[in-house]
Amino acid sequence: MSKAIPKTMKAAVIDKFGGPAVLHVARVPVPEPGEREILVRVHAAGIGSWDPWVREGGMGGTRFPQVIGSDGSGTVVAAGSKVRRFKVGDRVYAYAMDNPKGGFYAEYAAVPEDGAGLAPAGLSLDEAGGLAACGLTAVAGLDALKIAKDAPVMVLGASGGVGHIMLQLAKREGARVLAVASGRDGAALAEGLGADLAVNGKTADVAKAVRGFAPEGLAAALVFANGDKLAPALKLVRKGGTIAYPEGVEPVPRGTAGVKVRSFNGLSGPEAFERLNGLVSLGTFRVEICRTYRLDDLPQAHRDVLKHHLGKLIVKPRA
């Protein structure tokens, strides 16, 4: 590696699986990029609701200390000999779930070339830091639905990390979107992002809102948050329609007879990043950054990510 790249870096690590308190800041070696990997000087890392699951041992593994952090953004400072898509100096965002060389809760991250994309020109690196995992999951949701122009679609959880991105992508696909968000602030966010109708799922009669929005029934529903209160609204997806949800949503949504229910996972690979970038570039796009943390704040961030918040939480390792 270049002499300008240090041998060690500051990172938030875990030495064992457990609660938020196992996260602590330490100095660890800067990872060496392999021949098909890039080394990223991290600007920001997303904090996802799945990160506490990883911290608790959900992905397994026995190598400690372990750096987690499933996605992030930054600048390429070194590239392996067989890397063709990136060069030193490129602004990138990347996905690092289950990456053997560690995640983005660090000053540097080495990731496979195919797990990264050029940061969209219209986004800041703060926004790009929270985009990869949620954006690639949202694109998978589009594929699960195959949304038709002017189709009435409901997004449940429209103010969350994946949901607020899904709302914007669905509008780009030409859908009419009913956004069910968390709280008055969530409904205001969804309205500001272009929802045709935004309601507060905590207080609104969601089924009544659906009947007014789509008298003949919904063509589809994307479920990023669920609960017994929302079940009547899901029954208003019409015959031939689709309910889609990312794996991990509980309780699993159910539809009526003739409605397809599909689960999906986030996409990966160069084509997925290119598709997401293409959708983002179609107009004004926003990754809502709710709060920004430092590395030593991550135990609290892991508590906060499981509570009410809008959009994304991020950590800036160099703050």
Where are these regions (language model features)?
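Residue-level marker of beta-strand positions
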Residues: D90-R91, Y108, P152, R172, ...
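C-terminal hydrophobic helical "lid"/dimerization subdomain
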Residues: S2-K7, F273-A319
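Mid-domain Rossmann-like dinucleotide-binding core that forms the NAD(H)/NADP(H) cofactor-binding site
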Residues: G129-T203
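Short, glycine/polar-rich helix-capping loops at beta-to-alpha or helix-loop-helix junctions
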Residues: F104-Y105, A181-L189, P251, A272
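Glycine-rich beta-strand-centered segment in the early N-terminal region that forms part
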Residues: P29-G46, E56-D98
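NAD(P)H dinucleotide-binding glycine-rich loop of Rossmann-like/cofactor-binding domains
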Residues: R85, Y95-G157
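Glycine-rich cofactor phosphate-binding loops and adjacent beta1-alpha1 units
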Residues: A188-R262
